[in-house]
Design a protein with these regions (language model features):
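Low-complexity, intrinsically disordered Ser/Thr/Pro- and acidic-rich segments
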Residues: 1-4
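Conserved HGGG/HGGXW glycine-rich cap/lid loop of the alpha/beta-hydrolase fold
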Residues: 26-120
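A structural alpha-helix within SAM-dependent methyltransferase catalytic domains
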Residues: 59, 139, 167-170
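Catalytic nucleophile-loop/oxyanion-hole region of alpha/beta-hydrolase
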Residues: 87-91, 123-135
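Conserved acidic catalytic loop of the alpha/beta-hydrolase fold
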Residues: 103, 132-150
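Conserved hydrolase catalytic core segment
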Residues: 148-187
């Protein structure tokens, strides 16, 4: 029980860290690890997934290898700006330990894209942005943090965003690593 309580406390503290950057007309929650003077790895999580889903052991290993790591919540996720009404479960999840909030958020969403490439939102209305806007969010966050170039790593939809960064902002990427991703939405 003591081990569980300690782990829940660690997750709670971690979920209440980070900062908000106002970039690209949205508020983006972000957090970083390691020395800012080291080469940066920007980790981009997938659809409806908080940046806190990145495994802390993975982040610690990157930092141990002299890298600076930046994670952030995409739009309509976690503590970043919401364009439609934020689901009650997500509001609640912001105040709960990460292990509990992860389960709530996962059950609150179904990752869907409509025929126009817009993200389907819980209220049934399509979002007024696309993956290109989300790639620009990442680049604007890098600008905000004074990061010229970074290794860009994205999981799932984050991998699609990573690929767009490579196409639209190649001078900003030291390398691109899409994980569990595809080349895009629609016909391949």
């Amino acid at each position: 029980l003591a081990i569980l309580a300690t782990e829940l406390l660690k997750q709670f503290v971690r979920s209440n860290m980070g900062e908000i950057a106002s970039v690209n007309n949205v508020d983006i929650w972000w957090e970083d690890y390691g020395e800012k003077s080291n080469t940066t790895v920007l980790l981009i999580m997938g659809a409806n997934a908080s940046a806190l889903y990145w495994d802390r052991t993975f982040i610690d290993e990157l930092v141990a290898n002299d890298l600076h790591v930046v994670i952030f919540d995409n739009r309509d996720v976690g503590k970043s700006s919401w364009f439609n009404s934020e689901p009650l479960l997500v509001k609640l999840a912001k105040f709960l330990p990460h292990a509990v909030s992860k389960k709530l958020v996962s059950s609150a969403f179904k990752s869907m894209v409509d025929d126009d490439g817009n993200f389907a939102m819980p209220d049934g209305k399509g979002a007024k942005y696309d993956l290109n806007d989300m790639a620009k969010d990442a680049i604007c966050l890098m600008d905000h943090l004074g990061i010229e170039q970074a290794h860009i790593v994205g999981a799932s939809m984050g991998g699609m965003i990573t690929q767009i960064i490579g196409l639209d902002y190649p001078e900003r990427a030291l390398s691109l690593t899409p994980i569990m991703s595809s080349p895009g939405v629609g016909d391949a």
